[in-house]
Amino acid sequence: MIIYLHGFDSTSPGNHEKVLQLQFIDTDVRLISYSTRHPRHDMQYLLNEVSRVVRQGDDPGALICGVGLGGFWAERIGFLCGIRQVMVNPNLFPQETMPGLIDRPEEYADIATKCVENFRSRNRGRSLVLLSRHDEVLDSQRSAGLLAPYYDVVWDEQQGHKFSSLSPHLQRIRAFKSVA
């Protein structure tokens, strides 16, 4: 099972395309949609939904995959639910990059301090990070600097921020999922 978390643009047709691409790895791909506008509510909702889906599923190798803002959530929710994560161009600093787009961006900074202390050290090796060298929205180098000490970081030379095609990375994601 793969749980997919969309980014800020929850209505983008690219989400459906990514779900279809992920079905080449596992036919059981579940999109969990969330508001993107209310961080604390989103955290509680996603934690409850992902936990429920994982409990109901029978896949010991369940994986959570998030793009952009969904990558921010995939890392944290995956850690808290004990499943491996794939982050695609994760928005690690939404409090900086999304003021004016979300109601309370400062809640993201607060959430970051509420997660288990040093959670990345405890989560070491349990996340795969795909970063675009041509991300027109986020500073990929900053993300790599923060995440590379803990996770494998794979650079993509073609994609932009929305990372419309996961196809070149499906084999790597499949191998990462099978390690569970």
From Swiss-Prot:
Belongs to the UPF0227 family. InterPro entries: AB_hydrolase_fold, UPF0227, UPF0227/Esterase_YqiA. HAMAP family: UPF0227 (MF_01047). This is UPF0227 protein NT01EI_1813. It comes from Edwardsiella ictaluri (strain 93-146).
